[in-house]
Amino acid sequence: MTDPFTSDGAKMPPKPFTVEEGRRQVRSFVLRQGRFTPAQQRAFDDLWPRFGLDYTGAPRDLAATFGRDAHKVLEIGFGNGAALRFAAQQDPSRDYIGIEVHAPGVGRLLNALDEDGSTHVRLYHHDAVEVLEHEIADGALDEVRIYFPDPWHKKRHNKRRLIQPAFAQLLVRKLREGGRLHAATDWADYAEQMWDVLDATPGLVNRAGPRGHVERPAWRPQTHFETRGQKLGHGVWDLLYDRDSGIGNRKGNCPRRPDNPQRPQFSLCQFPIPDSPFPAPNGHRADADQRYEARPRAGRFHDGDVPVRAHSRRRGGIDRAGGLGRHRTGGAGRIVRRFLR
């Protein structure tokens, strides 16, 4: 395989992909420099030929890859691999494919799969969109799982989110009829975008009804990102969609909201939700938003009885001793004014 590091130790980032046709190329990920341990490097050197799939840009015969014809489950962005490893341990009758761009997580999962003696898991260290477009045949997947993708919570970064109309249409093509899409997020705003995109995608039917979510299914363990989000007061939303081209959210075939005739209100059919031994997600969207707004704010202090917010991200900071209207020069020669809030 291609080593995730060059000879001088620099990472080799995957090529960017186009989110929308006709627009500039936008990545849904940024490769952050993380700690790559010697054990993870050895995993790439020794275990990649056993578990890894090199990106070739040509269609791949998955039945030949796994040596059997079984249900194929794809997890996009598996992180440290905890959910993918759990699923492979719980259901060895299925074949699992994982895609991740961050080398440390891939190396960690390679070691875990070797420890488990897994034979039904294969990994890509590449951009998921390119893999789906060029290596996965249409209708080849029984399930796609996307757990806690990067929320890109700043407004100007929302365009980098993975769940976009073009990507949803790509998933519909790759799922077989009757297949399943399972997405999870702990950001209320991202859950809203997922509903906006997926509920309106032809061929996808929300199991929980319009803009609905389900309890955490038995096949998904609690992940690291989920635990971190709950500590910050976030809710968790699991969205399940069935691949059904005959009914559901299609233009001209779906009732529409009276206040907005351009948006579908609900799908024409619903499917039973699988039982889960896990408790329901904590909180509703409104409760999560309230907890988020009430969270402790870093960089706040008081001048007497007047609360003031410090611009802690600017070098040079704020002259806390000055009075109203005082100012000082910032780290880049800027004039940083001080405002009461």
UniProtKB/Swiss-Prot annotation:
Residues 156-161 are annotated as: Interaction with RNA. GO terms for molecular function: tRNA (guanine(46)-N7)-methyltransferase activity. S-adenosyl-L-methionine binds at residues 75, 100, 127, 150. Pfam families: Methyltransf_4 (PF02390). One of its GO terms (cellular component) is tRNA methyltransferase complex. InterPro entries: SAM-dependent_MTases_sf, tRNA_(Gua-N-7)_MeTrfase_Trmb, tRNA_methyltr_TrmB_bact. It catalyses: guanosine(46) in tRNA + S-adenosyl-L-methionine = N(7)-methylguanosine(46) in tRNA + S-adenosyl-L-homocysteine. Substrate binds at residues 154, 186. It is an enzyme of class 2 (transferase). Its EC number is 2.1.1.33. Pathway: tRNA modification; N(7)-methylguanine-tRNA biosynthesis. Keywords: Methyltransferase, S-adenosyl-L-methionine, Transferase, tRNA processing. It comes from the Bacteria. The active site is at residue 150. Catalyzes the formation of N(7)-methylguanine at position 46 (m7G46) in tRNA. HAMAP family: tRNA_methyltr_TrmB. PANTHER family: 3-DEOXY-D-MANNO-OCTULOSONIC-ACID TRANSFERASE/TRNA GUANINE-N 7 - -METHYLTRANSFERASE, PENTACOTRIPEPTIDE-REPEAT REGION OF PRORP DOMAIN-CONTAINING PROTEIN. Belongs to the class I-like SAM-binding methyltransferase superfamily. TrmB family. This is tRNA (guanine-N(7)-)-methyltransferase. It comes from Xanthomonas euvesicatoria pv. vesicatoria (strain 85-10). The gene is trmB.
